[in-house]
Amino acid sequence: MSEATEVSIELKDIVQEYPGKEGAGVLRVVNGVSFKLERPSIVMLLGPSGCGKSTILHMMGGVRPIGVQTPTSGSVLIDGKPCSEAHDDVVMVFQRYANRPDLTVEDNVSFPFRLKHWRKRVAAAEARSRVDATLKAVGLDGHRKHLPSQLSGGQNQRVALARALVLRPRILLMDEPFGALDAQTRTEMQTLLSEMLLSNPCLVVFVTHDVTEALLLGDRVITLSAQPAVVADDFSILEPRPRSALWQRSSEALKMEERILAQLHAASPGRGSLRVSV
């Protein structure tokens, strides 16, 4: 296992507002969210669809919409320092895997090392070694010369995950990365992520609206209410990963599921939607 590096992200009283439609005031999406994330772990940011989860994740990644102050108020701190733009230690993975269609699997994974910033930080030999090891780890070593169009959706998401992990990020932000995959492929990717993080430990913030996924992957689950989002619940899961199907049917897991659904119903009755996988 790689040596884990301590890292922290802190949100302090985050408020996010956007201009309303046709000049009708403002739309408050996030309403005073605060939490601190520390040490390598998987933190699940769970909430109903459209509640503001992705907005919060993008703030952590320094993604700022043009013409809108982000956040409207409050602050995002990485290792105790204000962060208002893209950060060297932060890498993002999206539901749309954004692989370049004209590049092979190998070239997509190694693409960051073409950029001047990463060429300075990682020697060419080390970059090649990382790419080779990561392709093997995600099960794509035999597909390295294939184009994205020749791959399945799950394989394309493996490419995106490999491209992120090859940079050895201290913080990995994942915006519903497996949400568009079929149930079997989603389960395979969840297992792969857990296994990959054993040898590449980092702080993962994973956005989902799937309660089952949150309980399967999370070391900590932060539940947000419907818009405007507030923190409805925040708890840790001590069961080691990867978690078995038997544990998922245990009384402990079922009580956690009931807790999440009850907290969300109390915080935002009848608004937004969650998924419970079967």
Name the predicted role of every residue range.
Residues 147-151, 155:
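Conserved ABC ATPase signature
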Residues 103-112:
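Short coil-to-helix segment of the ABC ATPase nucleotide-binding domain corresponding to the Q-loop/switch region
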Residues 126-138, 259, 263:
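ABC nucleotide-binding domain "signature" region
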